From Swiss-Prot:
InterPro entries recorded: EF-Tu_GTP-bd (IPR041709), EF-Tu_GTPase (IPR050055), EFTu-like_2 (IPR004161), EFTU_2 (IPR033720), G_TR_CS (IPR031157), P-loop_NTPase (IPR027417), Small_GTP-bd (IPR005225), T_Tr_GTP-bd_dom (IPR000795)
One Pfam family this sequence matches: GTP_EFTU_D2
Biological source species: Agrobacterium fabrum (strain C58 / ATCC 33970)
Keyword annotations: Cytoplasm, Elongation factor, GTP-binding, Hydrolase, Magnesium, Metal-binding, Nucleotide-binding, Protein biosynthesis
Segments for region (G4): 131-134
Positions of region (G1): 19-26
Name recorded for this polypeptide: Elongation factor Tu
Region (G2): 55-59
Segments forming domain tr-type G: 10-201
Reaction it catalyzes: GTP + H2O = GDP + phosphate + H(+)
Length: 391
């Protein structure tokens, strides 16, 4: 049977459920599919397949559903470690998150950790589902839990006072036992997600950026740089900058080709060769980027949120300490960097996630939210994301 065509007539948004173990993330995911998609039972979602992202194995379940306003792709992870890995590697991009918190327990350690991770990896918006409200008889207690969640969100720089909090029971929705806290709450939740989580800007509408993968010299024509356009559009005749590794320089794109055909422009997702004016074959190298002038700056020092692989995942067998010097693989190239651990952290064990400061030996074109792999001699030992730029 032919797959049904993916209708592109609605904006597409990627979201996911986050929160403490056993607070009902997977049950809620199942309940949403019941009313807005093709129903997936708890067991189907819980048996999440393994996938690889940046050399790291992660279990993630993907479901899709739609509201009258939008089409959603939704991720749910079976284990806490999968959440950490998922959010840091960006295996499943999140434009927003549904924080699930049990009304019976209130915020727990992983509730806090997932909110911190969401802040560090730049999840733009969170909506809260206060689950299991049927287990709380006292209305004042319910209010107290809501207040606690709002304060926790505010403490991590999310707008805790404005974030929608919907109270309900995923189980009631799945069992059709109480319409008010079941179906009605799920519908109210999705209305809040529609309204509160902003539609992401499409890559094509962002400023042009192409990581350089290769450089060729074509006799009689000049220098061609190749790569996959990450975002935006480049038109023949436009001025671009070459950023990273060496001092930033300007050039003009005098030709764009794809599959040996000449084009008048290249856009996000295209694998292109760009002919650049006045650049010698050795004036540009893999690991630099072509970009819209002034849109990206080179940096050496940044704060990163990183996950360090366990021995079982093919990572290090031993901890590392301050002054650890691995390679950081950004886009197309490895750059050596020096790691400084935060005060009070003696060492980092395989399997940890940690905030560290990194100083690269050469500057790389970077912005917040840029992801990287941590490698030792070509072997991946961790993954990370630029949380903030220091200099």
């Amino acid at each position: 049977m032919a797959k049904s065509k993916f209708e592109r007539n609605k904006p597409h948004v990627n979201i996911g459920t986050i929160g403490h173990v056993d607070h009902g993330k997977t049950s809620l995911t199942a309940a949403i599919t019941k009313y807005f998609g093709e129903f997936k039972a708890y067991d189907q979602i819980d048996a999440a397949p393994e996938e690889k992202a940046r050399g790291i194995t992660i279990s993630t379940a993907h479901v899709e559903y739609e509201t009258p306003a939008r089409h959603y792709a939704h991720v749910d992870c079976p284990g806490h470690a999968d959440y950490v890995k998922n959010m840091i590697t960006g295996a499943a991009q999140m434009d927003g998150a549904i924080l699930v918190c049990s009304a019976a327990d209130g915020p727990m350690p992983q509730t806090r950790e997932h909110i911190l991770l969401a802040r560090q990896v730049g999840v733009p918006a969170i909506v809260v589902f206060l689950n299991k409200v049927d287990q709380v008889d006292d209305a004042e207690l319910l209010e107290l839990v809501e207040l606690e969640v709002r304060e926790l969100l505010s403490s991590y720089d999310f707008p805790g006072d404005d974030i929608p909090i919907i109270k309900g029971s995923a189980l009631a929705a799945l069992e059709d036992s109480d319409k008010k806290i079941g179906e009605d709450a799920i519908r109210e939740l999705m209305a809040a997600v529609d309204a509160y989580i902003p539609t992401p800007e499409r890559p094509i509408d962002q400023p042009f950026l192409m990581p350089i993968e290769d450089v060729f010299s074509i006799s009689g024509r000049g220098t061609v740089v190749t790569g996959r356009v990450e975002r935006g559009i480049v038109k023949v005749g436009e001025e671009v900058e070459i950023v990273g590794i060496r001092p930033t320089s300007k050039t003009t794109v005098t030709g764009v080709e794809m599959f040996r055909k000449l084009l008048d422009q290249g856009q996000a997702g295209d694998n292109i060769g760009a002919l650049v004016r006045g650049v010698t074959r050795d004036g540009v190298e893999r690991g630099q980027i072509l970009c819209k002038p002034g849109s990206v700056k080179p940096h050496k020092k940044f704060m990163a949120e990183a996950y360090i692989l366990t021995k079982e995942e093919g990572g290090r067998h031993t901890p590392f300490f301050t002054n650890y010097r691995p390679q950081f693989y950004f886009r197309t190239t490895d750059v050596t960097g020096i790691v400084s651990l935060p005060e009070g952290t003696e060492m980092v064990m395989p399997g940890d996630n940690v905030t560290v400061e990194v100083e690269l030996i050469v500057p790389i074109a970077m912005e917040e939210k840029l992801r990287f792999a941590i490698r030792e001699g070509g072997r991946t030992v961790g993954a990370g994301i630029v949380a903030s730029i220091v200099e």
